[in-house]
Each structure stands twice: as structure tokens, then as C-alpha cells.
């Protein structure tokens, strides 16, 4: 066996602890059918020369313009775009780049973006033309845009966004503003079969009509949209700004309040052949954009729902919704906002705008309860119109307008109870106007496909904070849901006071010698337990809890490992929540944490990674985590990101501590986990010594206490060392089969058996008692043999 093969096997073996697992089948034919061939294309960069240091030399391909200092972009031949955040036209350029490219890294002064096939698909879906994209890049770039980039943009946008599947008056139409594209599609025999025919068997005529588009979301006069938060007058007063940039933003992002007339050509298709039509169009590289003309849908009844007068949208929330409803119809797609930035209000506003039956899917029962609370808080919907469908709460769905459930309930494949089966039949039989998908990137792509086949919705809106997955299924989900409609900049929201200003810190905790000796010797999963239960980590956690409780802060401590979670919480006398905790007990602990001044610290396992709404929390301490998962790190930071009352924007008002045992695998994982947040502009402060820790009275101060803890950890089974598996929630590994390595004693069930010998001298009081001759022969020393 070659070295490469051995390394490959080794990497597969260790995959469970290195990256976040997304359980899914190998991508087969069905998986590929949902993704256009152009989606996998990358920018080709073969002409760059490398210097002696390995850096790429682009001077020949990127000649500088004479006024390059006034322009904010560098467009590299490999598809990477660099934006100067200190440019006077930064706001204009940033809005354009968010529309056409994926953010890679956004620190303080220079932002990096990358052109991808999917980002360009998203750009054309919101109305940008190929010529617009290339023209604006040329205007904003300090250099000439490389020819390879121009060709890549043309290749990816030549067919994307040109054809739409529109639902009008409960009839499906394939619509386009390009008559030649419609004619090209109709030449295909499969699409010709999907076309609706009249009673005589003849094809229905092509429909030519003038479509008047007007945004369904009215533009707020106070929100200061247009060029985001920058002032247009200030830009025009700058003498170093080129004249051709003045009208740039107005051209790129037209004011959608003005009515615009567009001539379209369309033909009607058979409803029962929609799925086949979509697959065929993707095969022809003309993916259908789903748009829902909800205003003209007379078949599905309007529901009685409006926003309350107290619900005021923030500028970025309003902008994201204008991207969704920009042409008077509802576009399917993804809105990316940080945790705590008000994603729920965006979802409720979308439901109030469409005013058709709405299905909301979350990833836990707690998420369902919180979505119900959000609808009652922000909208005028009557409580009787909201129906929950979880394992604990199955409301009667009679005449219900808003249904809220979890992915696991809908994707459940085994036998259901009679009551659950009736609710599922009701969900399947309804025609849903809007489906809100909360953090759908946390579930496997295969499960999401199953959910899509069970319930049909005219418009799908995904709300997420982290558009990342550790597997390669991100493209599948992107094309199944729709394009990215809007993505916010975390640092801008923080500087504006919309989310908390967080101090992130990585606290290095030295391993005690006894624990480290065992850590080096043991090769099983118990290593994870050893660095999690490190006494110095426990002391650091206890010190931070005491320090912040004296400041009247509200603290959440996260631990993926249940053994560690219980040990920490019970020893410190704090309440804890994990998978088996009953729903009623969970809600009671959370309510006490929110309102009881005596309960300032709670311990939570990975069940609290998403959908736990705890706006009062302002300190988060992480003692164990899921390998190198970037998404989990961002989701956990989100628990303390909600804006704090009476906050001062210049000062840190929230704290995120990640406790890491030094010289262990945990340090490598920690670096990987921080990648996403560092790319958003956050910086992690490394703390090697906590000031004042020596003066505190903390647990495990003596060697004897540490030795007792070590014995307890060594007596734990391999199962105790594994992370929690949350039953009934996708995104967790299903417990069907597991393979573990261990000793023969462990496999034979003798994990808890410890052989101990110790000698003790008999006291005078006991010397008079009758002793068996076998023991009396040994004199005063008695040998005690104990098997635990």
C-alpha cells in the first residue's frame, strides 16, 4: 500500500473529529440533475507567472489606469476581487460586489470577493444583465478587466436568469423577455411535450404581454437606502472621484418604486409535468427562476395577516425584502443575515406581504415555539390561525393559515402515529404560498430533497446566518432553493449598533501533567474527554463565571460532550440543558435565565447551537465543540450578538471565550473553527493567563482533587467521550451503526471495573474481633482486594 493511500485512509478515519459531518449519499445521477453544468465552472488562470517567492505576477494582464487611485477595485485573472474599504465610493462598489460575487474575507481595510458561477446566477436573477456586470466592473476597476474574467461572466450569464417559471391564477407559465430563447426551448421535444394543449390537441398560442413591475415593498423615506449609508452629496464633492462613477449606482440598483414596463413572451405548461420541465431546462443550461405572482393568485385565499404598527424594519432588513419582492412578484432565494440581526422579522414581513398560506420549517422544537412567538409579536395573526407540528405539540390544523414544524417531522420515513399521519396528509394536500426555511444548511441535502417532494410551495425563502457547509452539497442546495438575494456585512451592522460589539478571546489552558501523560498514551476517543475535563480548563471556566456574575452579566456555557456538561454544571451548581431534557423543563430554565436575577449562568449542549432566542445573554464560554466546524462557531457567537439595551457602540458589550487545552488537537480545531468569523472581520485575542485567577478560591486546586478527577475520566466509557447525538434533529448523525476502537476489557463490558490493592494496619479496636486464619497469617497488615 502506497503512502498516499495510507494517508487517504487515515484522513477518512479521522474525518469524524476534523470537520462537520453532513450525512448524505454519494452524489449520483439524481443529485446532478438539479445542478446546471455551468455551476461547476471555475475561472481559468493559466497565464500568470510566478516569481521566486511563489507570488503571481499579473502586471502584463492588469495594466493600471491613469486615474487608478480614484477607483476602488482590483480584479485579478483568477476571479478574486479586492475592494478598498476606505474608498469614497466604497458603499456603491460594495453593494455591486455583494450582488455579483461571494464574500471571501472582509477585514477592516481591504475586502476580498470571488466570482463564482452561483454568484453570477444570483446576479442575473435579480435583474443584472451580462453587459451591466462587465461595464460596471470596468468602471470600478483600477486596471483593465482581464479577458478571461469577461469570458467567464458571459459563459455563466448567457443563459441564467433568462427564463422564469411563473404561477399566475394557479396556472404555470414559462416566461422570458428574450423571444429567441423561448423559440429555442420549444424546439426541444421534452419541453414541447410539457406545453399545454387545447381541447382539440393543438398547442396553445404564445402569449405576448407587457409586464409592469413595481416593488411589493414600499421604500422607506427614513431608511436612507440608495447608496446604503453613505451620502451621495459627499461623494460628488470629492474632487478625486471619476465622473463616470456618478451615475453608476443609480444604473446598477434602479429605484424599484418606479414602475417599469417589460415586454415578455410566455407559454402555458402542464402542471403535472413541472418537475420534468425543470429538470430538462437545467439540462439545457436554462435553469428556471421561480417567481410567484401572488397578487394575481385568485385560487389560494388571502389570509388575515398584517404587520403591527410597532414593527419597524431596519434599513438592511428592508433592502433584503426589496430584493425578494423587487418586481412585484415573490422570488425564491436566500437571505443571509447575522444571528441576532432580526431574521425572524424578515420572515414574518415576507409572510405579511404575500398574505397566502405559509409553512415555516425550523430545526428543533424550541425553534418552532420561538417562530410562533415571533409571529404573535410582529404580526396581527390570530393565535388560532397558527398550527404547530412537533413530537410534543400537534395543534389541530383546521382552517390554519400559518403552519410551523421541523425538518425531522416532515422528513420522517418510519411509521407515524395516527394523529401525526392525519396532520401530514393535511400538509401535503395544501397549496402553500410561502415556505420559510430556517437554517436549512444545517440539514443534509438528501433530507431537504425529501421535504421538497412532500410539500409544494410557490415561493421558498431561506433565512440563514452562515451560508457554509463542510461538505460539497452547497451548490445543490443553492439551486434547489434559489439564488442568494442579499447578504449583510457583519462589521457594518456592528458599527451601526444593530448587533452587539463582541470581544472574542481564545483562552489557552495548560494541561496538568497527569492529564497530559494519559492524553499522550491513550489513542481512543477518550483523548477528547481528557482535554475537555482538563482541571486548568475547569478552573478558567469557574473563574470567568465568577468574574462575569459579579458584573451582573448573563452567561451561557456550551459543551458538546454530555459527560463534561454534567460534570461542570453539577459541580458548579448551575442548571443545564441537553438532548433528553424535557421541553417543559427547557422552557422553565430559559425563562428563569431571562427573568430571574439569581439564575445568571446556564450550561447548554449542542441543542442550543441554533434557534435559542436569549437576547439577555452577553457572555458565552465554550468548553468543548464539534471538531473544526466553522458554522457551529458562528452560530454560537450568534447567541450573544443581539443588540443590548443602553449599549455604547464604541465599547465591547458582549464576550465570547473559547477555552482550549494547550498542546492538544483542540488547538488545531480551534483555528479551523475561527475561519468564518475571521473572514467576517472579527479578531480573536489570545489569553495565556487570566489576571486575578490566583486570588480566587477555585476547584481542583490540590493534586489530590485533580487525581480523583483523572480517575473518574479514565473510568468513563468510550460512549461518554462521544459528542451528543440530538435525537430527531437533522444535521446530527443518525445512530444506526457506529465503529469504535478500544481495549478487550472495554469491548467485553469491563470498562467500569477497576482492580485496586491497598494495605491497611488493623486498629486495636478491631484486633479483638474474630479473623479468619488465612488473613491472620499476614500479621497486622490486611490486604484489601476490591473490584469496582
UniProtKB/Swiss-Prot annotation:
- What EC number(s) are associated with this protein in UniProt? 5.6.2.4
**Record's keyword terms, sorted:** ATP-binding, DNA damage, DNA repair, DNA-binding, Helicase, Hydrolase, Isomerase, Nucleotide-binding, Nucleus, Transcription, Transcription regulation
Q: Which Gene3D superfamilies match?
A: P-loop containing nucleotide triphosphate hydrolases
- List positions binding ATP: 337-344
Cite the record's Basic residues compositional bias ranges. 1-14
* Compartments (UniProt record): Nucleus
Q: Which family does it belong to?
A: Belongs to the helicase family. RAD25/XPB subfamily.
Q: Where is the Helicase C-terminal domain?
A: 539-699
CDD domains attached to this UniProt entry: DEXHc_XPB, SF2_C_XPB
Keyword Signal found: no
Superkingdom in the source lineage: Eukaryota
Alphabetical GO biological process terms = nucleotide-excision repair; transcription by RNA polymerase II; transcription initiation at RNA polymerase II promoter
User: By its UniProt entry, which PANTHER family does this protein fall under?
Assistant: GENERAL TRANSCRIPTION AND DNA REPAIR FACTOR IIH HELICASE SUBUNIT XPB, RAD25/XP-B DNA REPAIR HELICASE
GO MF annotations, alphabetized: 3'-5' DNA helicase activity; ATP binding; ATP hydrolysis activity; DNA binding
Q: Name the predominant localization.
A: nucleus
Per UniProt, the enzyme's principal EC class comes to isomerase
Q: Where is this motif: Nuclear localization signal?
A: 3-15
Q: GO CC annotation: what is one?
A: nucleotide-excision repair factor 3 complex
Q: What is this protein called?
A: General transcription and DNA repair factor IIH helicase/translocase subunit XPB
GN (gene name): ERCC3
- Which SMART domains has this protein been placed in? DEXDc (SM00487), HELICc (SM00490)
- Any keyword GTP-binding? no
Q: Which Pfam families match?
A: ERCC3_RAD25_C, Helicase_C_3, ResIII
Q: What is the lineage of its organism?
A: Eukaryota, Metazoa, Chordata, Craniata, Vertebrata
- Which residue ranges does the record annotate as region Disordered? 1-46
